[in-house]
């Protein structure tokens, strides 16, 4: 605030917000509405109606992390429409594919599926998932692309794209991309240009770097294809490494081997036991689909907004100055011919818990890094993973479930410079847990580069003044609501403010 008058006005606004929230809560309790355990039907109603469609391409068996990512993915199979799982090659595994390893994980899932249904509806049967497993060509990279290289996997991608379904189809590439390349090759060889463009416009691709030479071919030959990647085989330059990076200066407990053993692997039934020990890095492939989880934060159609899978900007990346011999697997970075969604940088200051007074407040140590766009959410998505793994063996009463958050105003609003703004939300918890609110500005997600001062960020409502701007600017505010269950679970709401002069 620039003066005491502004501060008084904002405090009045906050008082009004508090009275409104108190009245709403009292009315709810008067009607018998309390934060209690909910029925499966009510739990289904709170899920996003719109599920994202997904096909996974995996070189499972080349590294234990594919199996780890598969274990996690199946725990979210009720909120993501898995439409195919294709066994592929990669630079690490060039001449054979391993669908039997996918089948083994799904068999383990089948042993716990009935218990998962006690917590949320919609988990598919193991038999339904087994039917989605397909084989890609047992060839490396572009050797498997062209006439005579159709495979069960490439034909399945085409069949799935052609479904009468308006939702985008996400292709999550954990290894080589040549099965997708072959599908695109066949589409171009058998369809009109207009039809190819229509079908390609339905695709959304996220590849974990380039693990064969087909990724650059795809990007060059299909310049309008929505594509997220850090090009080449220089894994150290990739955003996805934020999932398992040990970051000096923060608590890295939730990616430790001890944490995985306690919360994922041991005492969590057949699926937990199927989660292998880390060999190189934990779950390097998971970021390619993590942003599809409906949590109130992620919008996959806007990679520049940021979310559990990281944040990305659309531009044509330069070829970095590096020794090609250092590229893992021998997949070099080629010059990009068009913009792709790739590394973006966040200047992130982790919040800290207050021992006294304000429960949560801004910390003092900041990090400016592209990997921070992902690891900043890591404790939240790791705790979410642990809770879902608990669901495989525990009753509903024994486990924790995420809070439900609702805004008290639209998620997109417009104000003029100098106007006073108030936002509020209310949340309930299906287990009756106490909740902590935390509001913060996400500067990199919007166009306004300045910091906006707000009232106490750990209240259910905040107040602020729209900053002075010379042209329309957008500002993103995030509300994170975390319960005090074990493990603590978080859900979010995003408010996008357009400020006009």
Model-assigned labels for residue ranges:
Residues 7-11:
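N-terminal export leaders
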Residues 14-26:
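Bacterial N-terminal signal peptides
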Residues 34-448, 472:
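N-terminal acidic, glycine/proline-rich low-complexity segments
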Residues 441-465:
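Surface-exposed, flexible coil segments in extracellular/virion-facing regions
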Residues 465-471:
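Short, surface-exposed loop/turn segments at beta-strand-coil junctions that are enriched for proline
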Residues 482-488:
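Short, solvent-exposed loop/turn segments at the edges of extracellular beta-sandwich modules
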Residues 488-495:
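Extracellular and select intracellular beta-sandwich modules with Ser/Thr-enriched
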């Amino acid at each position: 605030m620039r003066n005491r008058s502004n501060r008084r006005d904002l405090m009045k606004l906050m008082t009004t917000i508090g009275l409104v929230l108190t009245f709403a809560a009292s009315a709810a309790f008067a009607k018998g509405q309390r934060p209690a355990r909910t029925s499966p039907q009510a739990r289904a109603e709170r899920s996003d109606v719109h599920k994202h469609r997904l096909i996974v391409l995996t070189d499972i068996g080349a590294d234990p992390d594919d199996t780890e990512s598969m274990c996690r993915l199946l725990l979210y199979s009720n909120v993501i429409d898995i439409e195919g799982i294709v066994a592929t090659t990669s630079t690490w595994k060039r001449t054979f594919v391993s669908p039997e390893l996918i089948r083994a994980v799904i068999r383990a899932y089948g042993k716990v599926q009935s218990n998962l249904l006690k917590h949320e509806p919609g988990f598919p049967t193991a038999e339904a998932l087994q039917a989605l497993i397909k084989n890609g060509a047992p060839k490396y990279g572009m050797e498997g692309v062209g006439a005579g290289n159709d495979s069960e996997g490439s034909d399945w991608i085409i069949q799935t794209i052609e479904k009468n379904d308006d939702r985008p189809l996400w292709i999550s590439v954990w290894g080589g991309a040549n099965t997708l390349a072959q599908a695109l090759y066949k589409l171009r060889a058998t369809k009109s240009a207009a039809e190819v463009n229509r079908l390609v416009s339905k695709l959304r691709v996220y590849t974990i770097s380039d693990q064969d030479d087909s990724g650059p071919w795809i990007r060059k030959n299909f310049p309008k294809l929505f594509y997220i990647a850090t090009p080449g085989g220089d894994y150290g330059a990739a955003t996805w490494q934020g999932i398992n990076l040990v970051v000096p200066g923060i608590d890295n407990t939730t990616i430790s081997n001890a944490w995985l053993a306690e919360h994922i692997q041991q005492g969590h039934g057949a699926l937990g036991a199927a989660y292998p020990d880390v060999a190189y890095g934990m779950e390097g492939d998971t970021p390619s689909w993590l942003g599809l989880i409906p949590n109130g934060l992620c919008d996959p159609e806007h990679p520049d907004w940021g979310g559990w899978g990281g944040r990305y900007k659309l531009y044509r990346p330069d070829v970095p100055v590096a020794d090609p011999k250092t590229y893992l697997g021998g997949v070099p970075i080629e010059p990009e011919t068009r913009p792709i969604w790739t590394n973006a940088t966040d200047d992130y200051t982790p919040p800290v818990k207050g021992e006294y007074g304000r429960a949560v407040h801004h910390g003092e140590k900041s990090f400016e890094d592209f990997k921070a766009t992902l690891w900043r959410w890591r404790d939240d998505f790791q705790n979410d993973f642990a809770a879902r793994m608990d669901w495989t063996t525990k009753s509903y009463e024994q486990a924790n479930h995420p809070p439900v958050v609702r805004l008290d105003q639209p998620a997109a609003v417009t104000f003029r410079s100098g106007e006073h703004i108030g936002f509020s939300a209310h949340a309930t918890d299906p287990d009756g847990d106490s909740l902590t609110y935390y509001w913060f500005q996400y500067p990199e997600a919007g166009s306004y580069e300045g910091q906006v001062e707000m009232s106490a960020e750990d209240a259910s409502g905040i107040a602020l003044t729209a900053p002075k701007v010379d042209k329309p600017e957008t500002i993103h505010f995030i509300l994170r609501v975390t319960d005090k269950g074990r493990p603590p679970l978080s859900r979010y709401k995003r408010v996008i403010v357009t400020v006009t002069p």
